[in-house]
Amino acid sequence: MARGLNKVMLIGHLGNDPERRETASGQSVVNFTLATSEGFKDSSGNLQERTEWHRIVAWGKLADICSQYLKKGRQVYIEGRLQTRSWDDNKTGDKKYATEIVCTDMQMLGAKDSGGGTSDASYSQNRPSYSRPSRPEPSSGNYGASPSSGGAQEFEKDDLPF
């Protein structure tokens, strides 16, 4: 049986501060809305803008980070999957449905003052964090020396192979 693909990638602005709760087992969960906008031309050729609102849910450590750093208006990149859940409405007895994006990766974008937090920070629910290895110090020799430090050599035009 062939596997399907359920992947969502969005860049938008938070419509509200994340609402943090805990499950009965103590696991963190946050919910927030994300607005994405796109431009299009109407039948008259006028430029219009359409905004789509998305329900986002994050769990565990990612939920804790979202509740701590994200604020209304903050621009973020969200990666996740679509999930539809259903429940019975206690008042009407009707079956209700909600489609939301289960967030597995989040990156804060934009300036610091656009909703708080640190710019360009990220967290992924699925992937381990890796840090860039430190750059080794140059060993003896003048590999990275600047011309002013005597590392460059003068060549005669006749010595060059081209």
From Swiss-Prot:
Spell out the SUPFAM superfamilies in the cross-references: Nucleic acid-binding proteins (SSF50249)
Enumerate the UniProt keywords alphabetically: DNA-binding
Q: Where is this region: Disordered?
A: 110-162
GO annotations of cellular component type:
nucleoid
Report any one BP term from Gene Ontology: DNA replication
Comp. bias regions, Polar residues: 141-151
Q: Where is the SSB domain?
A: 5-110
Any GO molecular function: single-stranded DNA binding
Which residue windows does the record flag with biased composition (Low complexity)?
122-140
Entries under HAMAP family matching the protein? SSB (MF_00984)
Q: How does it assemble?
A: Homotetramer.
What's the protein name? Single-stranded DNA-binding protein 1
Give the taxonomic lineage as stored in the record: Bacteria, Pseudomonadati, Chlorobiota, Chlorobiia, Chlorobiales
